[in-house]
């Protein structure tokens, strides 16, 4: 049996033994000692989290319209069928990923799913479900697992790019499925943050980003820089041919790079959706 430690060392023991041991790890960055005591009673692999890390959760959704005759994309007219998230730190390191397909919508609302913007991807979703890449389950189970991850990692902040949309559609879906018995998808008291606001404050003041947008015509009708996740990722990665996949977890993995990039600049920026 093996035990994975936060410092990435691996310790092996004979199966069935009860082992109590103490590991003292010297922090290279802060020169502090971290003591971890582990009791091992069975053949399991245990990952020990570093409690000094301020873990964050980045989430993304894909949706279908409730009323397909409504012009425009509004969270109040959207149900969530794809939810992906990752537990990360501010440097963008990933500690856990999740990818779920909401069976209540994906299977229960097949007619509406055919009007989803990315309906052509439905066959690929089924392939991913069969291969285990995505998990098909109820919205209630998805929410339960989210709450468990938040508790396990001590998460106090949830991020999305254009969080106003994801926050809205998740709540609309939650209220419809529970008949408004439960009105909010996220736990009470969690800080709701938006990488779009961060990017506008950080990249919006960078001459290099402005020049990049002008050079590639990534501008609004009024001539202002655009701040879509796809365009920002093209800038920070140097991959100007990058195309966003527009599935939950795949988009999360580029949005966490935006989060990390903004933090690396050490600039004053807004994070919270409502501030």
Residue ranges of model-derived segments:
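Short hydrophobic targeting helices and cationic amphipathic motifs
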Residues: 4, 8-9, 14, 22
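Short, positively charged and aromatic/hydrophobic N-terminal segments
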Residues: 12, 23, 29-30, 35-41, ...
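Conserved non-catalytic scaffold segment of RNase H-like nuclease domains
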Residues: 50-171
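A short, structured active-site edge motif that brings together acidic residues
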Residues: 100-103, 185-203
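Substrate-recognition/cap helix-loop segment adjacent to the acidic, metal-dependent catalytic center
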Residues: 164-191
């Amino acid at each position: 049996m093996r035990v994975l430690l936060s410092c990435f060392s691996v310790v092996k023991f004979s199966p069935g033994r009860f082992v109590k041991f103490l590991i003292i790890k010297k922090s290279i960055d802060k020169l502090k000692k971290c003591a971890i005591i582990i009791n091992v009673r069975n053949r399991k692999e245990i990952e020990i989290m570093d409690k000094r890390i301020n873990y964050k959760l980045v989430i993304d959704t894909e949706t279908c319209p409730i009323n397909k005759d409504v012009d425009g994309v509004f969270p109040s007219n959207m149900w969530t069928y794809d939810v992906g998230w990752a537990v990360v730190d501010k440097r963008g390191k990933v500690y856990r990923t999740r990818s779920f397909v909401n069976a209540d919508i994906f299977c229960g609302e097949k007619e509406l799913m055919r009007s989803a913007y990315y309906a052509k991807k439905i066959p690929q979703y089924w392939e991913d479900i069969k291969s285990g890449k995505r998990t098909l389950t109820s919205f209630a189970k998805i929410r339960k697992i989210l709450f468990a991850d938040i508790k396990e990692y001590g998460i106090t902040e949830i991020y999305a790019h254009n969080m106003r949309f994801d926050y809205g559609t998740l709540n609309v879906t939650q209220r419809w499925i529970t008949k408004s018995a439960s009105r909010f998808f996220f736990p009470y008291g969690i800080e709701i943050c938006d990488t779009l606001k961060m990017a506008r404050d950080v990249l919006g003041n960078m001459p290099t980003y402005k020049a990049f947008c002008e050079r590639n015509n990534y501008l609004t009708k009024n001539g202002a820089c655009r701040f879509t996740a796809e365009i920002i990722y093209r800038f920070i990665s140097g991959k100007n041919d990058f195309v966003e996949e527009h599935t939950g977890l795949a988009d999360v993995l580029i949005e966490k790079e935006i989060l990390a990039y903004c933090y690396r600049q050490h600039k004053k920026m807004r994070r919270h959706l409502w501030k």
